[in-house]
């Protein structure tokens, strides 16, 4: 499950737009960089001179700024006591578990499965639902490796050895590629 991030240059006054999924850390970071929410366009709008800083924000939250195919890993995360007291758990740039109301079952995000333990049928209060289920181990797939901090409660279980998006030149032989570059005036050396 690759997170879709896109930047767009707007015609008006040298602005850029960041199109991304919701993440609770993004509004404060965007506002701190002078961003404003465009309700109609469903995007954050920034001064184009801040593009590199805004891309850095996207990379820190989502693991990519949309210009690359980040290396993805599968991670297991043990729900901590602090996690269990939350209504929603965000990990790897996305929501991985959420309890909408006290007596609702916990819903897992895309690419997330329980490998051990479980969440109880209810948790928290009517005004403050909680996940509960401390000690439950979640497997979260397709996490950008740059977002993983390995510790006692989080560990990598497998790595994607290939980029998440194949190169458009993957099917072209080295000889054909060298011939085409030479035809275009490039000097090719090995």
Segments the model singles out, each with a brief description of its role:
Residues 1-190:
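Accessory DNA-engaging acidic/polar modules
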